Amino acid sequence: MIGNPPYLGYSRQDEDQKEDMKIVFSRINNYKKLDYIACWFYKATEYIENKNAKYAFVTTNSITQGEQVALLWPLILNKGQEIDFAHQSFKWTNNAKGNAGVAVVIIGIRNIDSSDKFLYNQNLKQSVKNISPYLTNTSNVYVSPRTNPLS
């Protein structure tokens, strides 16, 4: 499954889109700050679970940064899935009127297996052991906000 779902941050969603989010994440707390595209990732994750299938989306890079990572990625990676390949952030432009361009990433997801994973950046293709939700060659660690200092 491949696609280029709509990019809408939580503050730019209309009432219908907020209702979509509520339906998709009905069993999940803390979803309201997720970008709209998180719906596609979550539904695709459910769709390929325990199947011989993969999915990939072009998405804004926001789901690989900040609060989005700790909110979205455990929902995917804790279902026995992993990032199969990823193209790190690059500027996407098209011929649309008023197109300002946006920083995007391309992320492919699969059920966990032992085959190679690839990380792309411009003209570089790197075979890696793991691709983290931050699209780096590291383990899956999540940085979450805190209300109290560490010490």
Language model features with spans:
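Signature of N6-adenine DNA methyltransferases within the class I
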Residues: 1-151
